[in-house]
């Protein structure tokens, strides 16, 4: 074909003519036309634009156009007075698919072998010598307007790579790279660097360099590219990519930083970007530019104002001095590279050397991702980063890495530091700690805080133990050999805790063990000694962390710090001591509650000691189960324990109401004291749904002391336990797969469903259309209207007032102890359906008893001493037990007796109740039955109410 013939055509000189590379087509995100109107231009600029357009037209770079695309065009005047034409291609670039960078970074001139001769060339108008694909030309059309629209506008489109097009640099690199491929292949022993349109050639001898350059000229010309003859460099000093290259040394080109133009964030961002570009050559440590970096903080608007501080001005001056004096060295290609790590302030500094010649500096970024980064981890990160840089520069790992650690410290780092293991992964070279003897590194400001000296990983023996705590009310405290409370301005418990730890480190100039209930503070204190602290926009937090670090580093004695979980109710001295520290920082109300829990002081005493109101003091007493009754009851067989006051014990469960649709999961909570019910309908029964339900309960019922649930996953999750811990609520579960432990809430579920059915089938509440509205109406009825058996008030009244209404409360009874098989005397604390809570006497825990194991004492209530002493008169129940086994009617008679007693008592006539009780007692067989020992209580007893044995013939 024709193209093949052209490729094989031979000129009269005998040199093959190579066809220029084909244009690279662009990929477009959309076929939608892009038209941006041309803005008016002043007459002077319009005339300059016409001249430039005609010039480009003559050179064949543009052509007339009728394209439906348009981009604005404008001109700018250079310092020389010449005009330059530019096209605003932002709208077009937005619909071009990016090609991606081919050279992500500048090549380092330090890799050019030393003493090799060089030639540096610059391609002339490189973009304008590379054609656009024919189908893409119309996308880069522009319009030159006419003044007053007195004539049609002139339209052109680019035929070559336009300045400002998104992919122009990539296409240019590709074209030039293709042109240089034959040169690289033929002169593989030469060192050739190509970046955009700048080309550097180095060879071991001058003759070989000339041969290489001659061949390069021909290849570049055959590709349609032109060399700028006025920019060819053949002698030292060479200038390439901002560097001045000599036979062995490389220096940055002399520049002066204009400080008068530094006014906005964008100005400082550009300045630091330029400094960062030459930092590997300048060798300015990161810590030496901290004030310049701090100017970047704040408003992220590029046009936001910034002020050059005196400290930052000094750092700019340092940069200028380094530009004048800094230098690096070209390498010997036959000698290996080494990496030196110096423990400089703020963060470590890396130096790539060859023998004693400096090749490049390496630094970590000024800002870090973590709040605290250990210095050892920084060293490991810098090693990994610089190893990759060396491999990128020369293709090999460094021959040796020198670190500021002993052999034992290096061994421990491999064992304990994950960052160290990653940074040195697959390294087979030498790890040493002997630095070369040279003066070029002596200016570095070194630090000794590489590994911890004061902070210990294990508890200290024979050291003081101090507990710390902080509260959101701003108080910090510690307790131990002595106690101290510190008032802080912080409204964060963690920050107050941080102040407490700092104070302990300052107050105890001796070895100490610190125990804190803040995991965050503990972790920060453990690592702060050698850590780089990340800057935070919160100035208070910065000050606290810096003060903590300074305090730790100033200490002369070691310390150990560990974490303890708060409010766990675990036994042991650590928990008690931590609670004592908590008490020191609690608010007045919390202190009053904790003091009452400790001493059970009355409301007047609480108000006198703490700054609380009468209502708050009374609420504390009313919510205390010990102060409302004698003691907290213990669980006995066959009984569901109830709360003895509102919010003492809740039961909670999830039931299902299919008619509610996706809200069919109804979460139900019942207060076991008042039987107050609250329920919410939700879409599931996970922990998040349970927490949402409980927050609703808290808003209506208050916060309970204890909650009992089944063993569902929503109730047994760690997230739920954490939620309860935050609210200081204890939690118990029933026996798996046994619903009897949840009998109260199970019965409540049935009651609630029944009420819902009643409302739906026979109610007139047509307004209750949503599931929650139906549920709320049922709850209002059950809580505020219904009065249940053995109650005289509604559940809502009982829950809000805490008032007991059982008619049997305070009465003396006989109760059966199933463990000892004996009948004992007790006093009724509360009485419900099928259960009662009984106090056996002073200093004894109350017990929950089924009503079938209760029998009325039937005598005027005596004082506690006499009631307790009566136990000596109580007969053993072995005969009763044997009768229970032999005669099934006895148990039935007991139950009938209790039922009749309750019924008689409900009538309100004590005489009749006593008479019924005595009559039933005579039906029991044997003299050892407790009924036979019940004293006669008839007003006309001829024996004075003594033993009923003497009354059988007279009083009965």
UniProtKB/Swiss-Prot annotation:
Map the zinc fingers (Integrase-type) to residue ranges. Answer: 587-628
Source organism, top-level taxon: Eukaryota
**Which positions in this protein are listed as binding Mg(2+) 2?**
469, 582
Positions binding Mg(2+) 1 in this chain are 469, 497, 517
Q: Which cysteines are joined by disulfide bonds?
A: none
Q: Which InterPro entries does its entry note?
A: DNA/RNA_pol_sf, Integrase-like_N, Integrase_C_dom_sf_retrovir, Integrase_C_retrovir, Integrase_cat-core, Integrase_Zn-bd_dom_N, Rev_trsase/Diguanyl_cyclase, RNaseH-like_sf
Pfam families, A to Z:
IN_DBD_C, Integrase_Zn, RNase_H, rve, RVT_1, RVT_thumb
Write out the biased-composition intervals (Polar residues): 869-881
Q: What is its EC number?
A: 2.7.7.49, 3.1.26.4
Keyword Glycoprotein set for record? no
Which ranges belong to the motif LPQG? 161-164
Indicate the segments forming the Reverse transcriptase domain, all copies: 57-245
Using the record's annotation, list all stretches that form the RNase H type-1 domain. Answer: 460-590
Q: Where does Zn(2+) bind?
A: 596, 600, 624, 627
Q: Which reaction does it catalyse?
A: DNA(n) + a 2'-deoxyribonucleoside 5'-triphosphate = DNA(n+1) + diphosphate; Endonucleolytic cleavage to 5'-phosphomonoester
What processes in GO biological process is this protein linked to? DNA integration; DNA recombination; DNA synthesis involved in DNA repair; DNA-templated DNA replication
- The protein here is known as Endogenous retrovirus group K member 8 Pol protein
Instruction: Tell me the organism's taxonomic lineage.
Output: Eukaryota, Metazoa, Chordata, Craniata, Vertebrata
């Amino acid at each position: 074909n024709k193209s093949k013939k052209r490729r094989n055509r031979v000129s009269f000189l005998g040199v093959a003519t190579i066809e220029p590379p084909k244009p690279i087509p662009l990929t477009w995100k959309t076929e939608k036309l892009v038209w941006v109107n041309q803005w008016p231009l002043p007459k002077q600029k319009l005339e300059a634009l016409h001249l430039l357009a005609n010039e480009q037209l003559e050179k064949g770079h543009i052509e007339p156009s009728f394209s439906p695309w348009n981009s604005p065009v404008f001109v700018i005047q250079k310092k020389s007075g010449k005009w330059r034409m530019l096209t605003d291609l932002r709208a077009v670039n937005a619909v071009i698919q990016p090609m991606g960078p081919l050279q992500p970074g500048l090549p380092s001139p330090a890799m050019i072998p030393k003493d090799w001769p060089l030639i540096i060339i610059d391609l002339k108008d490189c973009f304008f010598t590379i054609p656009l694909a024919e189908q893409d030309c119309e996308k880069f059309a522009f319009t030159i307007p006419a003044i007053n629209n007195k004539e049609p506008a002139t339209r052109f489109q680019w035929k070559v790579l336009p300045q400002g097009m998104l992919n122009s640099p990539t296409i240019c690199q590709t074209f030039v790279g293709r042109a240089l491929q034959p040169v690289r292949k033929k002169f593989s022993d030469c060192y050739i660097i190509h970046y955009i349109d700048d080309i550097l050639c180095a060879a071991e001898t001058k003759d070989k360099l000339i041969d290489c350059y001659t061949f390069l000229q021909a290849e570049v010309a055959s590709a349609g590219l032109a060399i700028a003859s006025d920019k060819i460099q053949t002698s030292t000093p060479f200038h390439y990519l901002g560097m001045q290259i000599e036979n062995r040394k490389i220096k940055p080109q002399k520049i002066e930083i204009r400080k008068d133009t530094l006014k906005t964030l964008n100005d400082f961002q550009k300045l630091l970007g330029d400094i960062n570009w030459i930092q590997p050559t300048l060798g300015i440590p990161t810590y030496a530019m901290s004030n310049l970096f701090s100017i970047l903080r704040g408003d992220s608007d590029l046009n936001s104002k910034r002020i050059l501080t005196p400290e930052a001005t000094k750092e700019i001056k340092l940069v200028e001095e380094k530009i004048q004096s800094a230098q690096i060295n070209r390498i010997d290609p036959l000698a290996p590279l080494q990496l030196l790590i110096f423990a400089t302030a703020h963060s470590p500094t890396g130096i790539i050397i060859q023998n004693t010649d400096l090749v490049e500096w390496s630094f970590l970024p000024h800002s870090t991702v973590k709040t605290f980064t250990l210095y050892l981890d920084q060293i490991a990160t810098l090693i990994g980063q610089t190893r990759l840089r060396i491999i990128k520069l020369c293709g090999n790992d460094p021959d040796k890495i020198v670190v500021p650690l002993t052999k034992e410290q290096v061994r421990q780092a491999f064992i304990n530091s994950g960052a160290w293991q990653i940074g040195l992964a697959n390294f087979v070279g030498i790890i040493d700690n002997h630095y070369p003897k040279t003066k070029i590194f002596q200016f570095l400001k070194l630090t000794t805080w590489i590994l911890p000296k004061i902070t210990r990983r294990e508890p200290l023996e024979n050291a003081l133990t101090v507990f710390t705590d902080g509260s959101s009310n701003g108080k910090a405290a510690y307790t131990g050999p002595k106690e101290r409370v510190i008032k802080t301005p912080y409204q964060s418990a963690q920050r107050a805790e941080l102040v407490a730890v700092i104070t302990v480190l300052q107050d105890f100039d001796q070895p100490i063990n610190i125990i804190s209930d803040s995991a965050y503070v503990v972790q920060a204190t453990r690592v702060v000694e050698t850590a780089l602290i990340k800057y935070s926009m919160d100035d208070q937090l910065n000050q606290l962390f810096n003060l903590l670090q300074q305090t730790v580093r100033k200490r002369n004695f070691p310390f150990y710090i560990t974490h303890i979980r708060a409010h766990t109710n675990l036994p042991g001295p650590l928990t008690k001591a931590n609670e004592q520290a908590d008490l020191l920082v609690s608010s007045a109300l919390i202190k009053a509650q904790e003091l009452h829990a400790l001493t059970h002081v009355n409301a007047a005493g609480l108000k006198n000691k703490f700054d609380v109101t009468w209502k708050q003091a009374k609420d504390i007493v009313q919510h205390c189960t010990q102060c409302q009754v004698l003691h907290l009851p213990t669980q006995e067989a066959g009984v569901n324990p109830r709360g003895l006051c509102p919010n003492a014990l809740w039961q909670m469960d999830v039931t299902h109401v299919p008619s509610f649709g996706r809200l069919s999961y109804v979460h139900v909570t019942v207060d076991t004291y008042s039987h107050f019910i609250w329920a919410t309908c939700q879409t599931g029964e996970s922990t998040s749904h349970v927490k949402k339900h409980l927050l609703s309960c808290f808003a209506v019922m208050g916060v309970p002391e204890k909650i009992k649930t089944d063993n569902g996953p929503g109730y047994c999750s760690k997230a739920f336990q954490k939620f309860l811990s935050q609210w200081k609520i204890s939690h118990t579960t029933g026996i798996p797969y046994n619903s009897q432990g949840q009998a109260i809430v199970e019965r409540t579920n049935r009651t609630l469903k029944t009420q819902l059915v009643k409302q739906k089938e026979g109610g007139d509440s047509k307004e209750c259309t949503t599931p929650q509205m139906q549920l709320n109406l049922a709850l209002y009825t059950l809580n505020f209207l219904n009065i249940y058996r053995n109650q005289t008030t509604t559940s809502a009244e009982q829950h809000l007032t805490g008032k007991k209404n059982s008619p049997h409360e305070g009465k003396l009874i006989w109760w059966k102890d199933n463990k000892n098989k004996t009948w004992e005397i007790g006093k009724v604390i509360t009485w419900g359906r099928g259960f009662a809570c009984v106090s056996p006497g002073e200093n004894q825990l109350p017990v929950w008893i089924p009503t079938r194991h209760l029998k009325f004492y039937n005598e005027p209530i005596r004082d506690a001493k006499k009631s307790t002493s009566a136990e000596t008169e109580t007969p053993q129940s072995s005969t009763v037990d044997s009768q229970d086994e032999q005669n099934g009617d006895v148990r039935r008679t007991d139950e009938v007796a209790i039922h009749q007693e309750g019924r008689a008592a409900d009538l309100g006539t004590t005489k009749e109740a006593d008479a019924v009780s005595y009559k039933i007692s005579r039906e029991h067989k044997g003299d050892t039955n407790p009924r036979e020992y019940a004293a006669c209580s008839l007003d006309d007893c001829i024996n004075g109410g003594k033993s009923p044995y003497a009354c059988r013939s007279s009083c009965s």
